[in-house]
Amino acid sequence: VDELIKDLRSHEKLIKISDDTLDDLPVFVKKPNYDRSKLKPGIVHIGLGNFHRAHQAWYLHRLMQRGEALDWAIVGAGIMAFDKEQRQKLLSQDCLTTLVELDPDGQSVEVIGSMIDYVEITDGNSALIERMIQSDIKIISLTVTEGGYFQDPNTGDLDCTHPDIQFDAGNTQSPKTVFGAIVEALRLRRLQRNGPVTLQSCDNLQGNGNILRKTVVSLAKMSDPSLASWIDENCSFPNSMVDCIVPATGRTEIDIVKSLGIKDTAPVTHENFRQWVIEDNFCAGRPAWEKVGVTMSDDVHAFETMKICLLNAGHQILANAGEILELQTIDECMAHNEIFSLFDTVQRDEIAPHVDDVPGMTPEQYLQLISKRFANPKIKDTVRRVAFDGGARHSGFVHPTIRKAIASGSKIEGLALVEALWARMCEGTRENGSVIKPNDPSWASYQEIAKRAKNTPCVWLDETHDYGDIAQNEAFRAIFTEQLDRIWSHGVKSAIVHYCSSDP
């Protein structure tokens, strides 16, 4: 393969991926062996980012390579400005995607073809609604990020006061949000007797199916209580755990694909690990994902807890400290002595004790696995990407463990330090004086509070609206205050060393 790549680099012409050029791709590129013209849609997926294409779309592609699930092809959809550009890119290459697996021992390349169309993005989401009501669609799946569910951070319920939710409740036929579009589509499916569908969240949220159910049913109830009852009683919302590290695509990733002789305007790079655990709860059928490595289970809670509390929380430990010290990527954070010590100590001493075993994996084994994955030098997963939307990520990934630790009287010093590092990062400057660009939907508010917390640390707990009952715990308040004071007085490295060298 290396010799073939060298030969390709000597030629300037790139092969633009399309149905017509699949046979022209280099011999080392794996490609669809099925007739894509015979694929039929079965899934509408909202949120065609990199993760979906490297994960869910890949699993479906693997089934299609076996000659199965040919009537479960994906129709892409979205409602954001990004989605319009993404739609143009993917349609220009027949909805094919080049996946490059980056392993420390080498790389492999695959073009997947499980997606066949991309819904036009229109005002009022009329085209999306129209596609979701068609009887051939059996699953509506989503990757809209952890912060995209309009949750009240303290209660976990739908924030019915949010302006976009208020708008959708009063303008059901021309909604702004994904969830408003789903509610309207379900109303029409019910009216036209096209049957219920499975609504499948693929986001990093514990109980993501339960959260999606609550969001959709609560929004429907605001305008049509009988519809809300029909949705709750007839549609299914399976919980799932998803896992694969997928960096954002930038110039580096596009250049990697070009070096292979391929022109793809929206390629995806990913690590050599995937996991998908799904609650087997589908009201209108599903692909046989278990044939290609997906774990179908009656209970995914233990898998979710292990992944969210160790991997996702671990990402926040690394990224917040790394941003303050101007590190660029997660593998750089893992190679940084103090940051790695913080990551390893907090995980082993304060998070892992609250995580149960899952079949075939203990928390200790899982920590070893994710440490190896995070340290992969080929995956240039940026600190900025991982630290984005800290409000949603700390609330969803770190705070559940803090609550467990408080309730059990366990150690919280490291967890408090992690939260203090987030507050320090949100102040907006690094230790070298450089400015951190806004990186959160609520950045302006967080930054204003973080600046005041420099002198009065508990302001951060009291006014960010992310902590709820945690902010009322006197022990946590005292330790958080101590940790943030130490960060500002002595620096991040000193604060970490002090914590890691303290008696257990």
Write out the residue ranges for each language-model feature:
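Substrate/ligand-engaging "lid" and interaction regions
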Residues: 1-504
